[in-house]
């Protein structure tokens, strides 16, 4: 592991965890505005990350939550996406055609879009309603959104303890 940069990995995970207050504030605002369902939008590997968080949420909440493949959504649509929907996505480049097109379609149907976009100057970063730019740790960012919803619904009573432990130990324990 001659080229492995342990400190870089620790800093990366801790940086993602530091986004949590921003995520919590946004989720609080969206819940107050009446978000009723969650659409996790992806393509390729990001779609796989979406499916993981949906499986997790289905176990813990009765809130409608689903993963949608961006190309499929652009082709067939999804009647669940509309006013009251929060679409959550992640993009490294911010230029994937299917994701860009799906965001435009979801917004035309009244959905709000939260994008974790690695490049803050990418086209997609300007299209989404809420952009949080931070490189890497897609799954961690997705699960922080999910956990925040669970907490606000009363379905994650140990949230504060859990995240205190995540802040204290996760980054170091992963390396």
Positions of predicted regions on the chain:
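Cofactor-/ligand-binding subdomain signature composed of acidic, glycine-rich
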Residues: 1-25, 29-32, 150-164
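A short, flexible N-terminal coil/short beta segment enriched in small residues
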Residues: 15-50, 175
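Glycine-rich phosphate-binding loops that contact phosphosugars or nucleotide phosphates
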Residues: 33-169
């Amino acid at each position: 592991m001659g080229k492995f940069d342990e400190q870089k990995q620790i800093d990366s995970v801790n940086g993602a965890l530091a986004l949590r207050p921003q995520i919590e504030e946004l989720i609080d605002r969206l819940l107050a505005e009446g978000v009723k369902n969650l659409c996790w939008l992806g393509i390729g590997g990001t779609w796989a990350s979406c499916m993981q968080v949906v499986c997790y949420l289905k176990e813990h909440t009765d809130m409608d939550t689903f993963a949608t493949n961006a190309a499929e959504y652009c082709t067939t649509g999804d009647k669940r996406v509309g006013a009251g929907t929060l679409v959550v996505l992640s993009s490294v480049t911010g230029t994937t055609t299917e994701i860009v097109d799906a965001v435009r379609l979801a917004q035309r149907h009244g959905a709000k879009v939260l994008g974790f976009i690695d490049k803050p100057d990418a086209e997609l970063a300007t299209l989404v309603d809420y952009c949080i730019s931070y490189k890497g740790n897609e799954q961690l960012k997705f699960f922080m959104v999910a956990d925040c919803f669970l907490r606000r619904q009363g379905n994650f009573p140990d949230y504060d303890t859990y995240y205190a432990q995540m802040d204290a130990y996760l980054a170091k324990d992963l390396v």
